[in-house]
Amino acid sequence: MHSLKKVTFEDVAIDFTQEEWAMMDTSKRKLYRDVMLENISHLVSLGYQISKSYIILQLEQGKELWQEGREFLQDQNPDRESALKKTHMISMHPIIRKDAPTSMTMENSLILEDPFECNDSGEDCTHSSTIIQCLLTHSGKKPYVSKQCGKSLSNLLSPKPHKQIHTKGKSYQCNLCEKAYTNCFHLRRPKMTHTGERPYTCHLCRKAFTQCSHLRRHEKTHTGERPYKCHQCGKAFIQSFNLRRHERTHLGEKWYECDNSGKAFSQSSGFRGNKIIHTGEKPHACLLCGKAFSLSSDLR
């Protein structure tokens, strides 16, 4: 068993010139601090001792690291007078896919000028993310939890490969809810839901909709058009979906079964209403008095 050596700030530091730092916007500076503190926390979780220097305190407090008359990342602790040397620092380079938009937040590869040798595998690691991943792998720790399936993972710095399992074949992802879609057209729909945008407006009543298909369906309520007719009873519907749902009542099909009572329903609306009764949920609230109801029909 190898003893864990003491790690100083120099071992996990990232170096920029003053000119490079000045060119960074607020989001990139925040990203820098987050990456630095994350590297430190990973090493602490693995049992390494981190000497808490003035710089780390500055990072934790979110303070500016450049100060007039001082070099970038120079430790101002009186016990340590020498500035951190460039040869022992880590450079941060952006890695952006060729097909990625320019506005995409950059991912980071922290490259060591002096390779680190893993005691367990004997491999030389040149990236700080590789070092931490190597240490996590040998320790058996899995501190990252997948949002999609709850699976524990050892790779905290690069959870994307696992994430791709859940989004396989779906390359368009909403940056607000993380839901993935197979094409960009389908991605636009949830974005409108988040933003509240309703670009399709009825010229008769001025009611607005997020989708063109919803507008066309609404316009039929003004014209009275019901093109979908049941061959058995003659009842007509605005949408083909409503006709198919109605036809199930003639066939006696009941596709929706309640897990609690075992009761079956031919329509999803009836199934949802039954489920609300079991849960006690009252999602329909009166805007005037605030009283809530389980069913929308009770509210009306």
From Swiss-Prot:
Zinc finger (C2H2-type): 172-194, 200-222, 228-250, 256-278
Domain KRAB: 7-78
Pfam family, one: KRAB
InterPro entries according to UniProt: KRAB, KRAB_dom_sf, Znf_C2H2_sf, Znf_C2H2_type
The keyword DNA repair appears for this protein: no
PROSITE patterns in UniProt: KRAB (PS50805), ZINC_FINGER_C2H2_1 (PS00028), ZINC_FINGER_C2H2_2 (PS50157)
Keywords from the UniProt entry: DNA-binding, Metal-binding, Nucleus, Repeat, Transcription, Transcription regulation, Zinc, Zinc-finger
The protein's name in its UniProt record: Putative zinc finger protein 705EP
